[in-house]
Curated annotation (Swiss-Prot):
Cofactor(s) this protein cannot do without: Mn(2+)
Binding residue positions for Mn(2+) 1: H41, D108, E119, I120
Organism field: Influenza A virus (strain A/Henry/1936 H1N1)
Cofactor binding note from Swiss-Prot or TrEMBL: Binds 2 manganese ions per subunit.
Residue numbers covered by motif Nuclear localization signal 1 (NLS1): 124-139
Protein's recorded name: Polymerase acidic protein
UniProt signal peptide: none
Protein function: Plays an essential role in viral RNA transcription and replication by forming the heterotrimeric polymerase complex together with PB1 and PB2 subunits. The complex transcribes viral mRNAs by using a unique mechanism called cap-snatching. It consists in the hijacking and cleavage of host capped pre-mRNAs. These short capped RNAs are then used as primers for viral mRNAs. The PB2 subunit is responsible for the binding of the 5' cap of cellular pre-mRNAs which are subsequently cleaved after 10-13 nucleotides by the PA subunit that carries the endonuclease activity.
Enzyme Commission code(s) on record: 3.1.-.-
Residues spanned by motif Nuclear localization signal 2 (NLS2): 184-247
Top-level class of the enzyme under EC nomenclature: hydrolase
Family stated for the protein in its record: Belongs to the influenza viruses PA family.
Amino acid sequence: MEDFVRQCFNPMIVELAEKTMKEYGENLKIETNKFAAICTHLEVCFMYSDFHFINEQGESTIVELGDPNALLKHRFEIIEGRDRTMAWTVVNSICNTTGAEKPKFLPDLYDYKENRFIEIGVTRREVHIYYLEKANKIKSEKTHIHIFSFTGEEMATKTDYTLDEESRARIKTRLFTIRQEMASRGLWDSFRQSERGEETIEERFEITGTMRKLADQSLPPNFSSLENFRAYVDGFEPNGYIEGKLSQMSKEVNARIEPFLKTTPRPLRLPNGPPCSQRSKFLLMDALKLSIEDPSHEGEGIPLYDAIKCMRTFFGWKEPNVVKPHEKGINPNYLLSWRQVLAELQDIENEEKIPKTKNMKKTSHLKWALGENMAPEKVDFDDCKDIGDLKQYDSDEPELRSLASWIQNEFNKACELTDSSWIELDEIGEDVAPIEHIASMRRNYFTSEVSHCRATEYIMKGVYINTALLNASCAAMDDFQLIPMISKCRTKEGRRKTNLYGFIIKGRSHLRNDTDVVNFVSMEFSLTBPRLEPHKWEKYCVLEIGDMLLRSAIGQVSRPMFLYVRTNGTSKIKMKWGMEMRRCLLQSLQQIESMIEAESSVKEKDMTKEFFENKSETWPIGESPKGVEESSIGKVCRTLLAKSVFNSLYASPQLEGFSAESRKLLLIVQALRDNLEPGTFDLGGLYEAIEECLINDPWVLLNASWFNSFLTHALR
């Protein structure tokens, strides 16, 4: 570093830096980063002053080197770089002549035009952090502060930058060059990390020993010590800082910070239009399972064998017919596709040896359902760029849809308990952390609360379907493979159970890129009559395929069995995330853990046991028009899990946008509730950003409706 400094800086600057370090008793052979920092600071001070003069009329003027008119008065007096005695003599002389207030600390420059002292800062960290440290140290409104960073950022008192843009650009370019030169020699990282904050001489409560070490380790990024952080917090005025930042961005930006009051926010505007429809990749609350208990058949565990065994448990099959047609589809083709599945399964049963996989015959109705040969032919751009009217497809704006009650019912159902267990205790993974006892205890309590939850069934169903579909897409790219939709669970008595929900037929799947689409037809059993909520089933063709005998209070009753058929599609990246759905368990466990931690810190002991075993205690579970809903800890666990699962099942750009933008409004409202007097600018723009995500997605519309309930009672 020392060699670099001597090569990079003017010998006069190097000499001054050496003197300064000597004066403060510092060894430049050891403190090489400090040596470089002093040289940089000196150079910036000199560049700040260079070429700036005041003419006889007292006006500021810029004169380049070698100009014959250079007999003008220098605009800036340089104080930095002089020995301390001389520097204070200059400062005293300026104060006597101009009547300026004497500063407590030695400044770097004096500006004869603006009649003020200037403190120059050069930082390797965030400019605003360094600015606030300087301001906190100086504690004088009379000294003007101007901070530069090596990334081209700057900050000055009241955003008054003193110099013209070109002069400041020259300084920024030089700093950037120094950074590049250091980086090319591998010196930058060490230099960047070595910066210490301004030291303020103030009596404070002293923290020492272990607590001091912990405090230093717990600081946010960019803070090198507890003192820096204290200085930053003490001097921070958020609204003024934001206004300053905005005015730095552009001359046109003129943001006024408006106070955010209880009367300020309005509810989100939900779209009008036909009710939204189901868009999940598989049926949720409406799914029906054909099950076998204690499976021990030949080939148990091979999906096709399991599926055939499950199909044999049902005897009420009948000639299928369409009860709810798909508005835009060729419904007879869906009917023929189901018939083909039944016929080909029958063929397998007639064979001596059941195969492990089944590829369907490529019939015309299956080709239609799977979109075979429907995609427009791709042509290389170079072959058609000369065509005059070449244009992209006109795509229609998505039709606005209104919130329908079925999505709230779906969510409520996902929070409920089933009579089966869907995960084993070790599904979340073994602990490796040192606090294993508490971690295991929390995990076991949580698992017992959610193992029977319907949302957990959706996780295991999603993992199975996505894994099977991705495997088939890679292993049988050209085939229309039949994939059973299967899940496994344990009954209350602990018996194993294999369930069949229906079938998927996969289309051609030459998936080169993550976003390339594989089409599939899903055929799922259900007892739900689609004519009760036809809007929910807009994308489906529904067949009646049999009658099922069900036990009820009045004896056995016969109910029609339906098959929900639709064409759908997914991609490698979506299947990859579908396979990772178990993460939802982890996410909701972490949310519960943070609740336990908050409770434990108040009571100053681990509250895990009390948290889960105190059945009389209720916890906030969500918002409704009535206010905050509360429930048992088990219900809280299941609700958090269901939210996480629905975020995965209904993942979409609309959800991403809504979550990111509505969070900003949520934080503002929370700040208001905490009496932090939040200020906002362009609140209308934030509402616009949130509402442009409210189009037709059922889960997003439900979340927006919940958000409105929250706004209503949060601001009472």
